[in-house]
Regions:
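Acidic, proline/glycine-rich low-complexity IDRs
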Residues: 48-49, 169-209
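Short, Lys/Arg-enriched N-terminal segments with co-localized hydrophobic residues
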Residues: 29-48
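Low-complexity, serine/threonine/proline-enriched polar segments
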Residues: 74-173
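Short, extreme N-terminal segment that most often corresponds to the first beta-strand
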Residues: 42-82, 198-209
């Protein structure tokens, strides 16, 4: 007996479940990692829901204290659904991208693959940051103040993340802190450093949000 094929106008339930699952167990994370490696960390596929967290400190961190997939709070009450380890190739790609394309131009340079030098530039960054705050604040009016994703929301986002990046930062040298920071907190601390200060990149992990 032959059966005719039936074309469903929607995905079968298991596919939808996999796409929507928020906090997978260890096995699910391994499967996710495998898929990412096979696709050579396809930027188009993962740029929306995945990004990276960098451990950057003023002293070189022992590998036992590297940021890893279990360091941060994840799941409920956390920005991160889950975190995962990455391979060396992906790690270096994102370190290069951070220094060359994300951080303020000229403020940092490579000394080695996992060491960067702060060259100065805090005064200029502070001036630019304040000017941007004032410009964005001008868009807040009595008429726009209650807009759902309006100028108030955009200003709040900018104050936390002036680099407008999905990268997060972890500056604890002992690996005890259970949360990461957005780009404002990283730059705020950098502005306290003397030009020439060396910064060391420890653990770099993937996160899903």
């Amino acid at each position: 007996m032959k059966f005719s094929a039936v074309c469903l106008p929607f995905r079968p339930f298991p596919a939808v479940w996999l796409a929507c699952k928020i906090s997978p167990g260890k096995e699910s994370r391994k499967a996710s990692e495998g898929r990412e490696k096979k696709s050579k960390f396809n930027k188009l596929k993962f740029k929306v829901m995945h990004s990276k967290i960098f451990q950057i400190t003023r002293t070189r961190v022992d590998k036992d204290n590297y940021l890893n997939e279990d360091t941060l709070m994840q799941g409920d009450d956390s920005f991160f659904d889950y975190c995962a380890e990455i391979d060396d190739e992906e790690r270096q790609y994102h370190i290069d991208n951070l220094v060359n394309n994300i951080l303020p131009k000229g403020m940092f340079e490579f000394v080695s693959d996992d060491t960067i030098r702060y060259n100065g530039g805090a005064a200029q960054w502070r001036e630019d940051f304040v000017a941007d705050i004032r410009s964005r604040a001008e868009a807040v009016t009595p008429e726009s103040v209650q807009e759902w994703i309006g100028p108030v929301y955009q200003l709040e986002k900018f104050l936390k993340n002036p680099l407008d990046t999905a990268y997060w930062f972890y500056m604890d040298e002992e690996g005890l802190q259970s949360h990461a920071e957005q780009s404002y907190e990283f730059l705020r601390q950098v502005c306290e450093f003397e030009p020439g200060t060396l910064l060391y990149i420890g653990g770099v992990i993937d996160y899903h949000f």
